[in-house]
Amino acid sequence: MNRISRYYFHRSVLSLLIAAMIYAPPGMTAFTSNVIGVVNDETVDGSQRVDERGATNNAHIINHGNQEVYGGISNGSVIDTGGHQEVSGHGSYQGQANNTVINGGSQTISEGGISTGTIINDKGTMSVLTNAKADATRIDNGGAMDVAGNATNTIINGGTQNIYNHGIATGTNINSGTQNIKSGGKADTTNISSGSKQVVEKGGTATGSNIRAGGTLIVDTGGIAHGVYLDTGSALVANTGAGTDIDGYQRSSHFTITGGRAEHVVLENTGQLTVVAQTSAVDTIVDAGGKLIVHEEAVAYTTRLNNGGILDVREKGSATGIQQSSQGALVATTRATRVTGTRADGVAFSIEQGAANNILLTNGGVLTVESDTTSAKTQVNAGGREIVKTKATATGTTLTGGEQIVEGVANETTINDGGIQTVSANGEAIKTTINEGGTLTVNDNGKATDIVQNSGAALQTSTANGIEISGTHQYGTFSIASNLATNMLLENGGNLLVLAGTEARDSTVDKGGAMQNLGQDSATKVNSGGQYTLGRSKDEFQALARAEDLQVAGGTAIVYAGTLADASVSGATGSLSLMTPRDNVTPVKLEGAIRITDSATFTIGNGVDTTLADLTAASRGSVWLNSNNSCAGTSNCEYRVNSLLLNDGDVYLSAPATTNGIYNTLTTSELSGSGNFYL
């Protein structure tokens, strides 16, 4: 018997008296335990039973509360955390729950029960069991609904609906959130909006799903989805595994995935098709955000790889007839069985029998050249990467914004603007050409020989054990061998780290270049825009570091520790600074002839040992005595040099930032020439 009115009952005086018998044990709220009439606005924190003669309005079911609607009616109940409501039929009467709000509590609709208009809020749960019904349920963020019965017209706003065996959901609208269709569960006419998804698990069935732009349909192996419609900008995630059965329309074209064969599938916006062993995909379109994965013993025929799409061909997988756009990403290995296609520039490419030819890598594309295989004429653009494994060989690779990682051998690589070739331990690069804006990085135990370093190219390396480098640049030949670097050119991002116990000679640091010396260097030239440091790297200070004949011609040089012997600083942007020693075990020493000219600046920190230095400041070159806060106590900050020659030069004895009456003092055994002292 179906009743919709809460005022249905005609009750005797006796029944009214019974309905009014209320018992409340100590500590509990008074409520009607057995409802056979109509009760309003009760708070239930114990057990309440509503049979076919009863109805409740606006019940509040709180922690430990349990309302059993056993053939009766519940209108407007609110179920808080720890509260529970169970709705079931009794005999020929259906139990009804209307407009329930679940705030962290739970509601179970059992056989013969009906719910209408339930709202499930955060941490609230609703279970619709076999032969039970739920209509117009709303599942908000954090709420969950489990369906083994019948659910119609559900709205999902950030929550989750799970459809189990024998469960049927019809007319669901997923505005955000998820609908999971388990084995034996069915969903019909589901609308999936942006940011939401429908998941069809093995043995589950979806019919007539409509996936809007930004929405996602996920079909697991063995899942069934018939009559689906995917808008432009929606995502299909599926595979060709056993039992998978999908058909529908994308962009007004029919597609299918059935019997281990996918035809005319469009992948975009996180969509993904996985082609498993012994199956195939035909005429796939991979658009921006889409991905096609081809596994071992699987085949993809006539794939169109558009800008922003990814085609991933795994070991022993095959993909033939590829049409690759200029920004389509191919991810492949030279152990693929067969990969063929045409690039956007009309060049044919292939991977067969362990040899890759003319591969274009861009925008996330990766070619892995495996051991005992080869690649030739690979084009690596921005976002692309070629990985040359141990015992593999790559020949004629061109890097234009992309990267090549060399663990094996790379021959005749050309590095253009934005390109990077990294030679790893035991890797070898032969006849690499580095053009302006390109970078060659050689790591410990790496080898790079016959390099051509053109103007504006960057070389990044160190004097570490095992590094072997040779080549030519605008200043002649250069090399690193046996921990000795000779005639290196560092510019435009290039850098050299001279490790403790190693040496560099005749290095040139140009604009954008950098050199750090923890060992020894001689005749280093630091030009405008170049940076040089002695005695410090990002990891350590080195007291035994030493530099001789340092030439700072418009660049910047800083001595943190060690000894500088003989130096010149020139040009208005030229700057040489000797920092206050960090501690007693990392002293800073200056000795020999130091010449500051042409408006250059030379700064000496307090505590630097300059007693063996002969200073010349000429042509408005300036010497600054910079004590900072290092001169404490009551004594003056003392500076000593062996000799000081001024030829229109300047000396600044800036006041220490300490107690009044403390001064910088400069003592020299010989003072000559003409210039200015500023106190």
Functional labels for PLM-detected ranges:
Residues 1-679:
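Long, low-complexity, polar and repeat-rich extracellular regions
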